[in-house]
From Swiss-Prot:
Segments forming a coiled coil: none
Phosphoserine sites (modified residues): S571, S575
Organism: Danio rerio (Zebrafish)
GO MF term set: ATP binding; CTP synthase activity; identical protein binding
InterPro entries with a match to the protein in the record: Class_I_gatase-like, CTP_synthase, CTP_synthase_N, GATASE, GATase1_CTP_Synthase, P-loop_NTPase
Protein name from the UniProt record: CTP synthase 1
GO biological process, one term: CTP biosynthetic process
Any Gene Ontology CC annotation: cytoophidium
């Protein structure tokens, strides 16, 4: 087993997750089996109770693990499926050690950070690195480990010490360290500054770890003189200083690393068994990146939510939209609409915000209401859903978005004016969305219906069923405490509001569709968590196809061809450039 530790310096949030994912991608393209571990030095057991404003979205895994959004990057880049133990937190380690102490496993010894906490970290990493994450169920050969935060943080000290010991335990030829550092370029001088990187590397060395590769995050490519300066003062060869400058798309980062000889360095440093053969996987990434830069037609989606000021709150949703837009060769424009600004009360309080929000919504090609929690902004989301239904605008509701679509229909089509979710109005006379029996209201963490669950399609004419490939069931990831009230189901279906997907027992409503609407779909699960750059999520793909006016032609062709082949229902034909791009992508996919 080979271990690659990715650490960061100067500031957090400079792209360690993307770099770690990109390293894994180029190694996987060489035929190696790669896994990934993310270490978060916070005391929380998991990310389940985080505010989206605090830490971005909570990513959900197949086993129900609520983890850091970086694990979403690993899964998307590497096309793997991780488990909750691939996200290691200080809370998990301390909980494990304390439980052992309570059981008497330490035989009366004084339990300390060194050696007990550090040993537990090393054991966890070695154990988890062996768990297969690919579909072929083969034990990984390389484990990429990302240490969150920055070197020198008091929270990460036990982990740094653990890896200082770990490098000797597994031997030098099986362990290397990538250090990601910022090279700022002040606008006043325009000169790239190396001092922060020098100080960061010095601090890392003082803690017992020496970087094998220094990856420099910068806005523009590094000058040779700057690279030589970092090489000299940080005691590494010039080839070990890698420039990771800003690029047009994150999908170009693996190509950027490949061009600078990172694979060759790993071959020599870790004695990796890499064959000298064409890398078809990277060829796909290059084609995808090139195509994303050439897109001309644009499609706009209004994302109506309550966390719109912080894009990381909807990281996977945005990625799923990007994957689908790229699949139909359209440039994506996401219009963030704060749902609270759509509420009638805003017309009196802040009319400018109110009109701007409605202008964004009405000028969009499609509307998406993603998941969320809490009552704030829910009435605005219902207003947006009402407009999408009446104006026959393509709509996708995810989790809470589906539940609010049920509320909107009940209020306006069933004349249940007080219809609501018991989450927001426990005393409503028409509880169309109710608390699930297994939900424990006295505890917040880990009390939801989580992880991969099966959804059975009950209707063969379902649009979503066709988009999934005309299958009988799908398995997608869930994260919710409330569900549609099954006792009221028949009232909706009499009015053309169909529950076309249910759980295995037939008790929980999973998918809704509406008759006489080009695309009005709601899903209780979160399809964005399983979307991949080359395999977009079907519900999101359907939204983009409908928004671009291509859904009907795609469905008429049996959903077997690339969606880019579906001519526009609005214009009647596709451009020759798109047809050429389609032909190229299909030839690569067939390889």
């Amino acid at each position: 087993m080979k271990y690659i530790l990715v650490t960061g310096g100067v500031i957090s949030g400079i792209g360690k997750g993307i770099i770690a994912s990109s390293v894994g991608t180029i190694l996987k393209s060489c035929g190696l089996h790669v896994t990934a571990i993310k270490i978060d030095p916070y005391i929380n057991i998991d990310a389940g109770t985080f505010s989206p404003y605090e830490h971005g979205e909570v990513f959900v895994l197949d086993d129900g693990g609520e983890v850091d959004l970086d694990l979403g990057n690993y899964e998307r880049f590497l096309d793997i499926r991780l488990t909750k133990d691939n996200n290691l937190t200080t809370g998990k380690i301390y909980q494990s050690v304390i439980n052992k102490e309570r059981r008497g496993d330490y035989l009366g010894k004084t339990v300390q950070v060194v050696p007990h906490i550090t040993d537990a970290i090393q054991e966890w990493v070695m154990r988890q690195a062996k768990i297969p994450v690919d579909d072929d169920d083969v034990e990984p050969q390389v484990c990429v480990i990302e240490l969150g935060g920055t070197v020198g943080d008091i929270e990460s000290m036990p982990f740094v010490e653990a890896f200082r010991q770990f490098q000797f335990k597994v031997k030098r030829e099986n362990f290397c360290n990538i250090h990601v550092s910022l090279v700022p370029q002040p606008s006043a001088t325009g000169e790239q500054k190396t001092k922060p990187t020098q100080n960061s590397v010095r601090e890392l060395r003082g803690l017992g770890l020496s970087p094998d590769l220094i990856m420099c995050r910068c806005s523009t490519p590094l000058d040779n003189s700057v690279k030589e300066k970092i090489s000299m003062f940080c005691h590494v060869e010039p080839e070990q200083v890698i420039c990771v400058h800003d690029v047009s798309s994150i999908y170009r980062v693996p190509l950027l690393l490949e061009d600078q000889g990172v694979v060759g360095y790993f071959c020599r440093r870790l004695n990796l068994p890499i064959e000298n053969r064409p890398r078809k996987m990277l060829a796909k990434w290059k084609e995808m990146s090139d195509r994303s830069d050439r897109l001309l037609e644009q499609c706009s989606i209004a994302l109506v939510g309550k966390y719109t000021k912080f894009s990381d709150s909807y990281a996977s949703v945005i990625k799923a939209l990007e994957h689908s837009a790229l699949a139909i060769s359209h440039k994506l424009e996401v219009k963030y609409v704060d749902s609270a600004d759509l509420e009638p009360s805003m017309l009196q309080e802040e009319p400018v915000k109110y009109h701007e929000a409605w202008q964004k919504l009405c000028s969009s090609d499609g509307i998406l209401v993603p998941g969320g929690f809490g009552v704030r902004g829910t009435e605005g989301k219902i207003q947006a859903i009402n407009w999408a239904r009446k104006q026959k605008k393509p709509f996708l509701g995810v989790c809470l978005g589906m539940q609010l679509a049920v509320c909107e229909f009940a209020r306006n089509m069933l004349d249940w004016t007080d219809a609501n979710s018991t989450e927001f109005d426990p005393e409503t006379k028409h509880p169309v969305v109710i608390d699930m029996p297994e939900h424990n209201p006295g505890q917040m963490g880990g009390t939801m219906r989580l992880g991969k669950r099966r959804t059975i399609f009950k209707n063969k004419s379902s649009i979503l069923r066709k988009l999934y490939g005309d299958v009988d069931y799908v398995e997608e990831r869930h994260r919710h405490r409330f569900e549609v009230n099954p006792e009221l189901k028949h009232h909706f279906e009499e009015k053309g509001f169909r529950f076309v997907g249910q759980d295995v027992e037939g008790e929980r409503m999973e998918v809704i569709e509406m008759d006489d609407h080009p695309y009005f779909v709601g899903v209780q699960y979160h399809p964005e968590f399983t979307s991949r750059p080359i395999k977009p999520s079907p519900p999101y793909l359907g939204l983009l196809l409908a928004a671009a006016g291509r859904l009907q032609s795609y469905l008429q062709k049996g959903c077997r061809l690339s969606p880019r082949d579906a001519y526009s229902d609005r214009s009647g034909s596709s451009s020759p450039d798109l047809e050429i791009a389609d032909l190229k992508l299909r030839s690569i996919a067939q390889e």
